[in-house]
Every structure is written in structure tokens, then in C-alpha cells.
């Protein structure tokens, strides 16, 4: 009996160790469990597939409201070199999409504060998404301007960005696709100057059960179908819907931002449209 108990105990320890190893070596891709080293390329494949229809995709996934959410984020940050200042800001927009946030921040600074000196680094891991942003830039006041640069970078590392170099770090609808979200937050903290602001806009968890039921019905029933009809790409839209459900809830994500070293004011987030999306803010002290 003693020997049997010892064998059971040993087996339990082995299973526990194996479970930890499994947890360490694997991650989620939507609802699928995959090796961590495969996720980056799978996510790249999704966004290469949807790059040319990226704005349409966000319209479908948010019923068009993402444009209002982005406008609200930009106005909430209210960034720009003030007329009595000689220090332009250095922005970093990660997982840039087609540049909504990047161009919006520069527009806000220019139109509200007359700021024509602040600079913007636009970063994305996916070269197809970067090309979409570059094409869109050609129709903005920042076309061929030295004030804006596009970089192909992994948001979890940002190897080309020096420590303590950026004033504002923004990321919209991108961080949930990271393999290691905490590593991405740690990197955001690294590249920001003391006093710098981290701002994240991301799909989140609806806080009303009845509304959540309706939202999930819309998400899982209609979104993949519309992806098939609009972009001939059901699988990418299915992944994007599932990735929202796998993303941490508002409180958990706020605590992850704190864990990266940021001061998080108040409860740490602002729900938008009943929690369909949320804005998270952190300050590097």
C-alpha cells in the first residue's frame, strides 16, 4: 500500500510537471491549442489574408462603431506639442492596421495645437498590413514626410526601438493577437519615457448577460458568414471572433498592465458600448 501510494504520488507529480510544461510550451490560436512558436506565423497569415479588407473587417466586427471608439481614444489622449513648448512628442503606434490611430493622433495634434513637429513611428509585424498603412499615408498630409516612419517589428520585442524613447504608445485591436501579451506590455513599458502614456483600445467582455448573449450570437453566427461573403475568408473571421473571447477581461488586463510596471489610474479602463470594447491607460512613472 505504501509503495502504491508512493507510485501514485510520483505519477501525480509527473502529471503536474507535464501540465506545467504543456502550459509553458503551448498557447491558444482562437479556440485551438497550438505550440507557441507557431502562433506568430498563423496570426501573420490571418492578417495577410484580411489586409486589403482590414477596414471593412473592423466595420463588420464592430458594426462600424470602431471609428467612433478610435476618435474617442484620440480625443481622450489629447496629445500634441503645446504652443508654449519646444519639445515635440514622439509617438509609437503598434499593430497599426491601416493607420487610423497614427494619422488621427497627428491630425489631432496639428489641428488643435498647430503641432507640425511631433513624430510618429508606425509598427506592425505584418508587412502586408504595413503596406496598407503606407498606401493610405499617401493621401494624408504626412505623405513622404520625415515625421513618420513605418517599421516591421514584433510588438513583443520592438528591437528597433530604444529604451525610454517614446512619449505615447498606442495599440488598437492588436494586443490580443500577441503570443505573449505580458511580454508586449513589458516592452511598451521599456520603450516609453518616464511620464509616457500607454493606451490600448481592444475588444473586451460585455458586462450585461443579456447583451452578451446577443453579442455572442451575432459574433459567432453572423461574423464568419459575413467574412465569407465579403472577403471570401470565413476562417480568418472565425479566428478573430474566438480571439476576442480568449482575451482577458477588463480587470485582469488592467492588472497585467500594472504588473508591467505602469501606474494605472482609477479602475484602469473605460468600457465602450457596454464593454464590447475598452480603453486601458497606463502611465510610466
List each model region and its residues:
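Core SAM-dependent methyltransferase catalytic element
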Residues: 261-285
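N-terminal auxiliary segments of SAM/dcSAM-dependent transferases
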Residues: 14-45
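A short SAM/SAH-binding and catalytic strip from SAM-dependent methyltransferases
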Residues: 167-181, 204
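C-terminal alpha-helical "lid/dimerization" subdomain adjacent to the S-adenosyl-L-methionine
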Residues: 204-260
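A short acidic, Gly/Pro-enriched loop at the edge of an enzyme's catalytic core
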Residues: 156-169
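Conserved alpha-helix/loop element of class I SAM-dependent methyltransferases that forms part
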Residues: 53, 63-89, 104, 108
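A short glycine-rich, Lys/Arg-flanked "PGG" loop and its adjoining helix->strand segment in the class I
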Residues: 182-197
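Class I SAM-dependent methyltransferase SAM/SAH-binding core
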Residues: 89-158
